[in-house]
Each structure stands twice: as C-alpha cells, then as structure tokens.
Amino acid sequence: MVRYMVTSALPYANGPIHAGHLAGAYLPADIFVRYLRLKGEDVVFICGTDEHGTPISFRALKEGRSPREIVDEFHEQIKITFQRAKISFDFFGRTELPIHYKLSQEFFLKAYENGHLVKKVTKQAYCEHDKMFLPDRFVIGTCPYCGAEDQKGDQCEVCGRPLTPEILINPRCAICGRPISFRDSAHYYIKMQDFAERLKRWIEKQPWKPNVKNMVLSWIEEGLEERAITRDLNWGIPVPLDEEDMKGKVLYVWFEAPIGYISITIEHFKRIGKPNEWKKYWLNIDGQTRVIHFIGKDNIPFHAIFWPAFLMAYGKYKDEEVEAEWNLPYDIPANEYLTLEGKKFSTSRNWAIWVHEFLDVFPADYLRYYLTTIMPETRDSDFSFSDFKVRINEELVNNLGNFVHRALTFVNRYFDGVVPERGELDELDREALEEIEKAFKEVGELIMNYRFKDALKRVMSLASFGNRYFDHKQPWKTAKEDKVRTGTTVNISLQIVKALGILLEPFLPDASEKIWHLLNLDEVKRWEFRELPAGHKVRKPEILFKKVTDDQIIYFILNYMAKGNPEGARILLDKYYKREDVIRVAKEKFGDEAEVVLRRVYKDIKLKEKKEGKEMYVKFDDFAKLDLRVGKIIEVKDHPNADKLYVVKVDLGDEVRTLVAGLKKYYKPEELLNRYVVVVANLEPKKLRGIGSQGMLLAADDGERVALLMPDKEVKLGAKVR
C-alpha cells in the first residue's frame, strides 16, 4: 500500500502568516491530506517553523531582542493561526528542537565524510560600519539576471534565480544601507556538480508540474556550482568540526531547514510513542512512500535541486535495524504568487491580508473557500475584496447554503424531520444519483492532480445541480397532491446534501461538520457514498453561511490594514466605498474612538459636534466620578489569547491590580516594567480575551503613536490624580 509523507514549506518564525502564504503552500497541502485521510490512505502531514533564517537575526537586531525571543513568539502565533485556519498538521514542530540540531550536524558530517564538501577561503560580504560579516539576506542590490532592484543576496524574488552577494550589482548593507566590502572568510561548500547527472536523470522521471520540471532542468543544464553551506552568523546550528577557522560559524539555513522535515517527523513519532516509525516514511525501505513537498514558486530550486542533493550527499542511512537510501521527493507541487488588489504582497510595507487578523472578522471557511477559488496553481492570481464578497454571497450563501437549507426545511415541514421513502424514480432522479457518484470520482481525480480550484468548482456544481433539481421538481406544489413524489424529491435532495457533507470536508471542514451535525450523523466520513436510509431522523435547519457585508470589509480595513498601511487602506476605501459609509461604520464600531481610527486614513477628518457655537463639555461632577491614581507596573506578560495585548500587574500602593493593555505594538515589555503610570481605578472590571482587567492605563494616541501618561517625578503609589 502506498504511503504519503506530505510537508508544507517551513515558514520563517519572524512574522505572521499572510493569505499569500496560505494559498501557496498550506491550504493546498491541507486539501490534499484531508482527501487522502477520507480515502483511508496512510498519510503523515508535517510542518514547523524555520527558526534560523537570517530574517530572524535581522529582526532581532532591529528590535533589540534576542533571536530566541523572536522565534518563540512567532512559533506560537503561527501555530495558532494554522489551527484557526483549520490546517490539519499531524504535528507542527520547529527547527530549535534538539533532534534537529543533531540530525543537521549528522547530515553535514556525512557529506563531509563522503567527500562532497570542500573548504574554501572566499571573499564574504562585510559591513565596515556595523563591523560584521553579512549573511546573504543582509545584502541587497540589483539582480544581474533580470535587473530587478533591491533584491536580497540569496535569491531574486522577481525571476527566482539563486543569487550570491558577489554577483549583485551595487551591493549594500541591508541594516545601514551603506556599500559593503568583501573580506576573506573560510567556509564549507557542497560540490553540487557531484550530483548534476543523477539529479537530471531522476528529475526527468518525476511526475512534476511542467512549470516546476522545466525550470529545474534548465538550471541544471546551465551548470551547477559549489554552494556555501556554512555562514558567519551567531544564531544557528554550530558547524560540527573542531577547526579553528570554523569557530563561531553555523550551518547555512538553506542547508539545514529542509532537514527539518525529517527531524520534525522523528519528533512527532517520538511523542506518540512510536520512535522508529519515521523510518518507513523517510527511508526507501520498500519503495512504497511518496514524499510530497507543497511549496511556493520561490522555493522550487531549494526543494528540487539542493534538497535532493543533500539527501544524496548523506548516502545510506544505517542503524541496527535498517540500511537504506533516503526517499527523494516524489512530487513538488509549487504554486505561483497571490497579489492583493493588483499589487504584490509586501510584509515590509504591510500590504497584506494577515490571516490571524482576517479570521477575527470572517470565518475560516470563507477564507479557505475564496483562496481555493483563486488559487495560483499555474499563474499569479489576485485577492480582491469585492470579488471575495461576491463569491461568498453568491456561491456559498445563495447556492450551497440555500440548497442545504431548502432540503432540510422541506423534510422537517412535510415529513417531521424523517427521511422519506423513495417512490419510483424518473430520469431526473436517476441522473441526480449518478451525479453524486460522478462527483466523488471526478473531485478525487482533480485533487490527486493538484487541481484544487477545479475540484472545488466541481463540488459546487453538485450544489447547483441540487438547486436545479429542487426547482424542477417543485416539491412545494407536489406536497399538496402527491406525497410519494414529494418524498422522492426530498429523499434525493438529502442524498445530495449528505454527499456535499463529505465532498466539502477537504475544502470547508467547518461547513462539512455542520452538515454532518444537521443530518444527525455519527458515522465516520469516508470518500464513498452511502445513502441516508429512509426513516433516519435529521435535525432542524440552521443557517450554514451568512452574507459578507460592506460594513465588515470596511471594519477590517479600518481596524487592521489601516494600522500598518494607512495610505493603502485609504486607497482601498476610496476605491469601493463612499466616505459617509466609512464614517458611519467607524462610529458604529469604534464609538468614541471613531475619529482616532478615521484619522489614520483621512488626515482632515473631524467628527466632534458643536452646540451653539461651543464645544460640548463634560460636567465637572461627571469628571469627578473618575478615580485616577498613580501606579507602578511591576510585571508584564504576553496575553495567551491575543497577539496585541499585554497582561500587566500594577502596584497601586494598597493593592496590586491586573490589567489588560493593548500596548504590544508600541512598547517592549522591558520598556513598561517599573514605569509609573496613571490608572482609571474605578472602571468596571471586564474580561478581555478571557482575562479580567481591573482598570485602564491612560495614554495619548494621535492615530500613529501611543504614549503612556505618567507623572514627571516619583510620587507615592496610589496618589490621586486631580
């Protein structure tokens, strides 16, 4: 029996996941794996955070934090984001696991012992200003192949070619922006030319997407060169050699990161009490395992050339139980890029749909549905808010949701919620049952060919067929004159509903589960159709999907996108909505904070009302009701359930209060600790994301920056502010 080892590209633990990431490597893999599980296949789905990339060191340097603090924060955030998006990894690990250090060093030593490494003293990028060797990604310049400017020194994001700082045109330091120099430094290189012929023969036999196969073969034809696999960096896996010129150096992340697929698999099976089970997935023991890597287009060279070469360089794995070669990738489904409103996603300019923020406003199934319908399988595609709204409302709500609701409404209204017996079938009835069988076959074939967009379209065509069938049979009319005919119509409609409950599972797991609940089923879902028996009792109908409103989209843009990219948010709002509608939504959603929120995008906005030529006043008696006191922050912790909140403890002299404060974007924990602050002490306690807040810190907010209010000299804790 064939078994599947499925991976998604390891995300860098230096920032959150955006919709482009999800559509590229994670949602496609999840659809594929969920289908295999429904088929009863032997499949393991692995991923984890890549925690030694130079972007992590770069971010830590910029923020004055340690790399470990960065990776711990984003590992947890990314893991929770995937859970919320219903990405069903068997295990989500990390490359800071001890097993990953051990295995990565083992891979290096095996390649070293097998003669595939060579030490060379070469010129390495060095910044005279920052007094440090620069990893490739810390160097930016113009790509010599396509002329794209501001490309990092490891790969061009435009043409996809691997780069080195030496070949960049006008290279400069990404930290300070100054021109760089090159200094001598010893490093180990992998002799890629050792594997060129073997790689070519192997790739020619693989069932890869044409865009992947053609790109990779052309690179091999141009000639493979030696590539450095060690770096001058203080964060990463140490080079496992006792050589003077290797001290303080680490394994290059592009060498050790893909080894994470194996180390995370080992950790997974260790944790479930099967420490040797990983071998049948990663070692070619019986030729029955298919290793499938889901990636984005930018990762093609690393997974199709370098990663297989590392596995070849290791040679045979051998222990007391087994001796075997490593399994090479069976397939590498690589998606193209997703754009946002016609522009490339940009994390630096905050032009992105951050998944954890999007899921604060919209259900996971909505995001999964839309991203699947526009999935960039063979060409770049675009995320558009207007298209998102239309597709959800017309396809999910009006088509799928409407059909399920109609069928359940009729069985409850005319048959007390019991599946009726079928009478004699006519041609359309038989066509409906055949359509169900065809849908299972065709959707499965499309998924196995990584055509997820077409597969979902085929599922939705069954819902459309159901609506047409229902309209043609007109059970609202036959119910008055032909109970048997009506029963047949309702029975077959419910069979279609059950089929949809299974077919939707890979794409919309929440909707699938809800349909299963409404049908009152406890059987395990399988990728096969077994009819609902007559006499089975179903539940009363519930709304499956709610329409997306303009107000929701306006709120999302104002509350999330405008914080990081106010100009981009303003352009979006002006493109789709009247300003008065934006103002109305801001007032409804943000209340007294509406003007502050709106001024992020409309600098000239002013909402304060005037009465008889004078500003409205607050009465002194109302102000006097506030109990404002001086306190001192004595503890700062991350909120366990929110990305932007701290849980702080404030000493008010006679008591210590716990407060929840939205200051994470503006202050580091160490900047808050021991700071004197002003607290609203008699504010009604309120739970924020599951933690009670006993007051509020006062701060000034000009729409861009936030500054805490504090006394200009030390006073007694608990002193009143008058």
From Swiss-Prot:
Domain of life assignment: Archaea
Entry keyword RNA-binding: yes
Q: Which is an annotated GO molecular function term of this record?
A: tRNA binding
Protein's gene: metG
Motif 'HIGH' region extends across: 11-21
Q: Which residues form the tRNA-binding domain?
A: 622-722
Q: Which organism is it from?
A: Pyrococcus abyssi (strain GE5 / Orsay)
Q: Could you say which cofactors this protein requires?
A: Zn(2+)
Stated name of the protein? Methionine--tRNA ligase
Q: Does the keyword Oxidoreductase apply?
A: no
Q: What is the lineage of its organism?
A: Archaea, Methanobacteriati, Methanobacteriota, Thermococci, Thermococcales
